[in-house]
Design a protein with these regions (language model features):
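Conserved catalytic core of Hanks-type protein kinase domains
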Residues: 36-37, 75, 114, 176
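Ca2+-coordinating acidic residues in Ca2+-binding motifs
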Residues: 47, 64, 103
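Short beta-strand(s) of the beta-wing in winged-helix/HTH DNA-binding folds
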Residues: 44, 79-83, 121
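Short hydrophobic/aromatic patches on the structural cores and recognition surfaces of FHA
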Residues: 16, 48, 72, 88-89, ...
């Protein structure tokens, strides 16, 4: 049996695909948890519970987190979110997960076309300033990486007299 593939599109309007089929979750906190774990790797349970449910008491936040993990794994049909120990959460390293952010950050100049807008563009979590702040930081980070890569490509294209590509990258920069 082929291994399931979870693909996250995070640059521009975000979406989640399981084996080429888009997955829609019943509440945004599931998406937020997946996005946060994918970008940050292993995180402390209390940290993520506090970020996603900052207006709730600790016990309620932890209960909500457990339910969110259960719902995510149930809807995705497997153990995608795991707890290597009682205090840490991560995406399962044995599962196949890929994203546009990974490809883009590994080789930005080669993957400029993946930058289709701000990180998690249009994604909003009600009552979660900490999550919104994190998203803002990530947006700045990826936008700066994009701008740097565009300038690098412009230099390369200028040196090779590839005016068509240079014009395309200038248009990318102007669109920001």
């Amino acid at each position: 049996m082929a291994k399931n593939l979870l693909r996250l599109k995070l640059l521009g309007s975000p979406s989640v695909f399981l084996n080429q089929e888009e997955v829609f979750f019943p509440f945004a906190k599931i998406n937020a948890l997946l996005y946060y774990l994918h970008i940050n790797g292993a995180v402390n349970r209390e940290e993520i519970a506090g970020i996603l449910w900052e207006n709730k008491d600790n016990q309620t936040a932890k209960k909500n987190l457990r339910n969110t993990i259960y719902q995510a794994n149930k809807l995705l049909g497997g153990e995608w979110i795991v707890a290597p120990n009682r205090t840490v959460l991560s995406l399962n390293p044995e599962c196949a997960i890929e994203s546009d952010v990974e490809l883009f950050t590994d080789h930005p100049a080669e993957h400029l076309s993946l930058y289709q807008g701000d990180f998690l563009q249009g994604f909003y979590l009600k009552d979660s300033e900490a999550f919104d702040y994190w998203v803002s930081k990530m947006r700045i980070r990826y936008e700066q990486l994009y701008i740097q890569a565009c300038y690098q490509q412009l230099e390369t294209e200028k040196d090779h007299l590839d005016l068509e590509e240079a014009e395309r990258n200038l248009r990318r920069l102007i669109s920001i």
